[in-house]
């Protein structure tokens, strides 16, 4: 199987062979050793299965790919409102440390920055959509200078395509190959 092949590629001694065998809806609490871990379903946002793990006694939350700190997030699934709500939920938790899926550990300031980015691109994309601008043009037109220190600005192509899909009320995303092509073209233009 693909699973067994991947074990061989990375070294099976480094992999846990037990697959997940419990599902939940919305939220659940688990005991891991002496730790209480609260799991919250916050997707679909980045992907369909977004979950955050909150360890209240340690005042830490593990966000998975809900947070890309110092990098442009990528909105594969959406809707963006779920992602913004996930940020609000994280901010409402009693946490000192936020462990993102990508980049350095942060605090609530990092979460607010991602929330502000998502709100900004939503509003900017909506204005352009309402004015009849095509998604590909909007990607190039939206001013990202406030986020110029963040990596991977080409992800705006996927984000705007996802937002336009959301505005049209469609579920099916663009072909992934097309989205990667658009990101590549944005990289080439910045060259």
Predicted segments, located by residue:
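Active-site HxH/HxHxD metal-binding segment of metal-dependent hydrolases
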Residues: 12-13, 17-32, 48, 123
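C-terminal regulatory/interaction regions
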Residues: 133-191
């Amino acid at each position: 199987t693909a699973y067994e092949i991947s074990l061989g590629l990375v070294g099976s001694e480094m992999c846990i062979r037990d697959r997940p065998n419990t599902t939940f809806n919305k939220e659940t609490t688990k005991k891991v050793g002496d730790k209480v871990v609260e799991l919250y379903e916050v997707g679909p946002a980045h992907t369909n299965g977004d979950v955050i793990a909150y360890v209240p006694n340690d005042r830490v939350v593990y966000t998975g790919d809900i947070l890309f700190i110092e990098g442009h997030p990528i909105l594969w699934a959406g809707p963006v409102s779920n992602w913004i709500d996930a940020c609000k939920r994280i901010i409402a938790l009693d946490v000192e440390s936020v462990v993102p899926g990508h980049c350095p550990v942060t605090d609530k300031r990092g979460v607010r920055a991602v929330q502000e980015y998502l709100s900004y691109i939503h509003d900017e994309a909506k204005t352009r959509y309402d004015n009849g601008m095509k998604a590909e043009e909007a990607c190039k037109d939206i001013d990202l200078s406030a986020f110029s220190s963040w990596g991977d600005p080409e992800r705006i192509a996927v984000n705007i395509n996802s937002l336009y899909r959301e505005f049209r009320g469609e579920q099916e995303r663009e072909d992934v190959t097309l989205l990667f092509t658009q990101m590549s073209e944005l990289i080439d233009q910045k060259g």
